[in-house]
Amino acid sequence: MSTESYEDAIKRLGELLSKKSDLGNVAAAKIKKLTDELEELDSNKLDAVERIKSGFLHFKTNNYEKNPTLYNSLAKSQTPKFLVFACADSRVSPSHILNFQLGEAFIVRNIANMVPPYDKTKHSNVGAALEYPITVLNVENILVIGHSCCGGIKGLMAIEDNTAPTKTEFIENWIQICAPAKNRIKQDCKDLSFEDQCTNCEKEAVNVSLGNLLSYPFVRERVVKNKLAIRGAHYDFVKGTFDLWELDFKTTPAFALS
């Protein structure tokens, strides 16, 4: 099917209106509608580009140019003390929540902040994201942060038992990593509402990820030698609280901030 050029379309419209002048008002209305749609489309693209530009200029003026010593240091190397696993959810950026500065934390974000068990044949992206900061950068702390209203956990809790993932290409397969958390919550919290079950699963899924971290030899070795600490956390952006706990698989926080 051939595509008519802009010039040909305008020419054909002109010829039609010259023959049928009574269509003038109809054509004017359609042209106005098309013009409005094109202007809106162009405006949306412009807004996105301008947001990116203005965001960088703000960063450069208020951060980069005011901290030459820091950026000269970062240009040479990085020595982060934290490796953080956090959700890709746009509401839970760990750098904002914990006020991490550039160079302070190596951050890995994915759906529902999950860490799969050690397996050389799959999830190599997570394995690489673990291996590099631990074996090369020698981070001293791993923190896995769950959060309130997590869509990944809600999706996990909603999957019917003993059924294969069918609705999505990647998501359902990924969130099954923390199926043990779902199973435990379904058993231990069966009398709670679905919403409360999800809240509990947000925390229990963190514990599953903490356990999975120990399946990586280079993680386990450093934990045993007290060279690496592993902690779980839960950020509630509805209540404005942050719970932190040690690697004892208890959801009772070591301390809570509010």
Swiss-Prot record:
GO BP, one annotated term:
carbon utilization
Q: Which residues carry this modification: Phosphoserine?
A: 95
What CDD domains does the database record attribute to this sequence?
beta_CA_cladeB
Q: Which UniProt keywords apply?
A: Coiled coil, Cytoplasm, Lyase, Phosphoprotein, S-nitrosylation, Signal, Zinc
Q: Which family does it belong to?
A: Belongs to the beta-class carbonic anhydrase family.
Tissue specificity field: Strongly expressed in aerial tissues including leaves, stems, flowers and siliques, and, to a lower extent, in roots.
Q: Is Nucleotide-binding one of the keywords?
A: no
Molecular function (GO) terms listed? Answer: carbonate dehydratase activity; zinc ion binding
UniProt-annotated location(s)? Cytoplasm, Cytosol
InterPro entries noted in UniProt: Beta_CA_cladeB, Carbonic_anhydrase, Carbonic_anhydrase_CS, Carbonic_anhydrase_sf
Q: What is its EC number?
A: 4.2.1.1
* Residues making up the signal peptide according to the UniProt record: 1-28
Q: What does this protein do?
A: Reversible hydration of carbon dioxide.
Q: Which residues carry this modification: S-nitrosocysteine?
A: 201
Q: Does the keyword Magnesium apply?
A: no
Cite a GO CC annotation: cytosol
Q: Which parts of the chain are coiled coil?
A: 24-54
Name positions with the PTM Phosphothreonine. Answer: 35
In its UniProt entry, what is this protein called? Beta carbonic anhydrase 3
What PROSITE patterns would the database entry show? PROK_CO2_ANHYDRASE_1
Query: Could you tell me the superkingdom of the organism this chain comes from?
Result: Eukaryota
The record's catalysed reaction(s) read:
hydrogencarbonate + H(+) = CO2 + H2O
